Amino acid sequence: MPRACLLTPPDFCVLWRSAAAAALMLLLGGWVFAQGLAFSEALLGWMEREYGVAARDRVIELQELIAASAQISESGRLERVNAFFNRVSYDSDYALWDQKDYWATPFEVLGVNSADCEDYAISKYFTLISMGVDEDRLRITYVKSLTLNEAHMVLAYYPSAEAEPLILDNLTGNIQPAGERTDLVPVYSFNGADLWLAVNRMDGKKVGDADRLSLWQAYQAKLMRQMAVGQ
């Protein structure tokens, strides 16, 4: 059964870092966010060596899903991406990676065919960007699940700047407006550029650059290394 996950609430005194380091990470990470996921024969070979033939085939399926998206409406892209990753089984970071809080890339998720809540949300984020969805419409959102009384992470999609966001969640196959998810209390959200503290279920107050989140910095660098295999 899908579960929320044991995320650690952000300590914003620790998350801030120097402006020079932030600028460097923005330069390194810009290509990832502008272009989305990149696939190559070298990457597929690495997947097979690391995780086996079935994992390689899952990455090919993701590649084909992205390639087919040009003929699909944006709402259709949301539905397909949500369904694609929600079929991956849930497990904790301790069980999967022997760590308290590990953010797995989409390739690692498909490698082990299992994920914690943040892995679902971030994998959906990068896949939708790869399909041409504007990054400004997407926010990876840290919430508290009132049902499970646990920290959780979801992906919010904003049809327009002032619109109520839609929530993509591994706990349910239904994509619902944020106002209907009374079981979730937002804490903060971010995308490739910005970081927001929650004001209500539908909006937040911008407080800086997303690169001030240390896990996000490490995630960007790791994903770039994986996509650069063989180059």
Regions found by a protein language model. Give the residues of each.
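A general, composition-driven signal for non-globular sequence regions
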Residues: 7-11, 29, 118
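A structural boundary/capping signal
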Residues: 2, 31-231
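Bacterial N-terminal signal peptides that target proteins for export
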Residues: 2-20
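Bacterial N-terminal signal peptides
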Residues: 19-29
